[in-house]
């Protein structure tokens, strides 16, 4: 591991832990007894360019996937929000690969649904693996396992365990800062029940496809593109 004080700012990834101001977030914090319930990846430490798996819209808590998060998503009028930002030194090659991966996933975000089944397994410290489908902590772990040997992408980590491993790189902890820029997505757009149902059905279909591809791999046949 590189010493963070000797690492150029451009060669750091940032892991952002957040206490989200919504009911599900509060419930998760009660169950886990941890002050933070959400984790994101940032390329520059700013809160107007974070990447994670989360709800797509404010009123669709069970419809989510890969998102680029802007600071407006957690602003104060939605409730009190705390944040903790940890910096992680990486090589130029690791930074470049992570940046390219995030750009690719942003361009194809519809292919990456939220892993609801795995989310319900969290209290039991279990995971449900589905290709391209993660919870926020699973996605952060997947990224971290490619740049930090302390993280094993095959294992289960609680958000608290991730915090503890990254705590030496903490650069900020406290109230969520006021947004520096306007929200560039449709997070606050109201969605109808029909919209919600249609996308829930689509996510089920994607998961079935993931299972089909996994079974074909186990049987030795090549997975379809």
Predicted regions and their residues:
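Cysteine-nucleophile amide-bond enzymes
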Residues: 1-225
């Amino acid at each position: 591991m590189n010493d963070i004080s000797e690492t150029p700012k451009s060669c750091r990834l940032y892991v952002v832990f957040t206490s989200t101001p919504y009911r599900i977030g509060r419930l998760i914090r009660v169950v886990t007894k941890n002050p933070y319930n959400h984790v994101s990846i940032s390329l520059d430490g700013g809160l107007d360019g974070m990447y994670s798996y989360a709800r797509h819209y404010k009123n669709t808590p069970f419809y989510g996937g890969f998102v680029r998060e802007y600071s407006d998503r957690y602003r104060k009028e939605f409730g009190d929000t705390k944040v903790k930002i940890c910096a992680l030194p990486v090589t130029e090659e690791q930074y470049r690969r992570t940046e390219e991966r995030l750009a690719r996933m942003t361009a194809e975000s519809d292919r990456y649904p939220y892993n609801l089944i795995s989310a319900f397994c969290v209290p039991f410290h279990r995971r449900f693996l589905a290709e391209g489908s993660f919870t926020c902590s699973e996605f952060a772990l997947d990224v971290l396992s490619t740049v930090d040997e302390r993280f094993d992408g095959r294992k289960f980590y609680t958000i608290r365990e991730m915090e503890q491993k990254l705590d030496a790189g903490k650069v900020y902890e406290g109230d969520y800062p006021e947004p520096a820029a306007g929200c560039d997505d449709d997070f606050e757009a109201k969605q109808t029940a029909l919209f919600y149902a249609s996308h829930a059905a689509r996510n089920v279909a994607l998961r079935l496809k993931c299972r089909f591809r996994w079974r074909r791999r186990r049987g030795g046949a090549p997975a379809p593109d």
